[in-house]
From Swiss-Prot:
Protein purpose: NAD-dependent lysine demalonylase, desuccinylase and deglutarylase that specifically removes malonyl, succinyl and glutaryl groups on target proteins. Activates CPS1 and contributes to the regulation of blood ammonia levels during prolonged fasting: acts by mediating desuccinylation and deglutarylation of CPS1, thereby increasing CPS1 activity in response to elevated NAD levels during fasting. Activates SOD1 by mediating its desuccinylation, leading to reduced reactive oxygen species. Activates SHMT2 by mediating its desuccinylation.
Protein family per UniProt: Belongs to the sirtuin family. Class III subfamily.
Subcellular location field: Mitochondrion; Cytoplasm, Cytosol; Nucleus
Keyword NAD set for record: yes
Enzyme Commission number(s): 2.3.1.-
Required cofactor(s): Zn(2+)
Binding site for substrate: Y102, R105
GO BP, one annotated term: peptidyl-lysine desuccinylation
Organism: Bos taurus
Single GO cellular component term: cytosol
Cofactor note: Binds 1 zinc ion per subunit.
Annotated Deacetylase sirtuin-type domain residues: 37-307
Gene that produces this protein: SIRT5
Protein name: NAD-dependent protein deacylase sirtuin-5, mitochondrial
Amino acid sequence: MPPLWIIRNRLFSQLYCGLKSPVSTQTKICLTMARPSSNMADFRKCFAKAKHIVVISGAGISAESGVPTFRGAGGYWRKWKAQDLATPQAFARNPSQVWEFYHYRREVVQSTEPNAGHLAIAECQARLHRQGRQVVVITQNIDELHRKAGTKNLLEIHGSLFKTRCTSCGVVAENYKSPICPALSGKGAPDPQTQDAGIPVEKLPRCEEAGCGGLLRPHVVWFGENLDPAILEEVDKELALCDLCLVVGTSSVVYPAAMFAPQVSARGVPVAEFNMETTPATERFRFHFQGPCGTTLPEALAPHETETVS
């Protein structure tokens, strides 16, 4: 039988955005710790001792590379919020519009590069691996910037902009074409005055498996869909092993990912939050470092004086 908290994660395995925590007020009080520290020297002591580090990343780290977050007052594509388009219902209703939205996102990401935060994580992972220590990255992002930075041990829990899934045969495939199909060339402009292209469904991305030709969809987790149970089990395993957790650029409001770090903290494991602002989970963590991840992470993850040179 799986551990109790993986069962609990499954209960919350539908993707929600902007919802208040389902944890009761009484439980919140029990989980709340003293005000988190911003003492980098103290964090570095924890970092030097850690053998199995888990990094949980969200949209904030990629925003520093110029990737739109689709959150807050400016979080619109044309007149739509991401929550309006990133659903199975929206795709069934208007696959052309949804593919325009994702084509725009693919094109934006293909023109961006990993920032100093991504690179610091990847370099730290490679360096500690040579020392027999582990760094695992669990990301909510679908932009593959961690992968582009060189991160190897990576769990992309919400999928990838650069993978497709056939709605007929179910095959998942990598796809880095630009544009992904000829009909989307020059489409997807985010301006509110732009009219939908109204691309016929037969001209949208199609499956290339022999004898199929089914309509493709982005291989991402949409609002209202379940996360892959196999990935959640991998996440559960890594969180159970970790002795230091970093929460990087995440708002801590999207479930089930918002539960991961507080659960680790409840076991007494040090958790450090790196973000531009505080979040609903900040008070549960031992450390909080405010500012751009590209500034705070390189200092936090730099080689410690106790590390062996390799």
